[in-house]
Amino acid sequence: QDARQIERMIEGRHGLMTLMAYELGKLGGMAKEETPYDAEVAGDAASNLSALASVLSPELFPKGSAVGEAEDSEALPAIWEKPDDFAQKISDMEEAAAKMQAAAGTDLASLQGAMRDLGAGCGSCHETYRQKD
């Protein structure tokens, strides 16, 4: 892939992560009881998150897009050193987002339980495959 294609992939994954963080912020605020629980808002945010998670793919991380290889990248080389584990973590994220979609609009306790799993999935991938700020 050429430099421009790689740059577009990085922009795409940054945009995707930004949108996911936006929806997670709504859910996290409710889970932490910083904002009132609203089943409709939670359900919509979880549906959006699940749809976004389904777009997340190892294809958004082409070779040549690691930290030090491409501008604005936070992707660690471990992504390409352990591609099967990376792909599994993405799959786990999709599964956790689907569980959140099923739980979020039910009640606060269900949202909180799903949020723990979702947060653990996000953290696990970022800990291993994303450069710390």
UniProtKB/Swiss-Prot annotation:
Binding site for heme c: M17, C122, C125, H126
Keywords annotated in UniProt: Electron transport, Heme, Iron, Metal-binding, Periplasm, Pyrrolidone carboxylic acid, Transport
GO cellular component: periplasmic space
Pfam family, one: Cytochrom_C_2
Entries under Gene3D superfamilies matching the protein: Cytochrome c/b562
Function: Monoheme c-type cytochrome, that is particularly expressed when cells generate energy via aerobic respiration.
One GO-annotated biological process of the protein: electron transport chain
Mod. after translation: Binds 1 heme c group covalently per subunit.
Molecular function per GO: electron transfer activity; heme binding; iron ion binding
Location of Pyrrolidone carboxylic acid modifications: Q1
Protein's name in the database: Cytochrome c-554
Disulphide connectivity of cysteines: none
Keyword match Electron transport: yes
Main localization of the protein described in the UniProt heading: periplasm
Subcellular location as annotated: Periplasm
Biological classification of the source: Bacteria, Pseudomonadati, Pseudomonadota, Alphaproteobacteria, Rhodobacterales
PROSITE patterns: CYTCII
Native organism: Cereibacter sphaeroides (Rhodobacter sphaeroides)
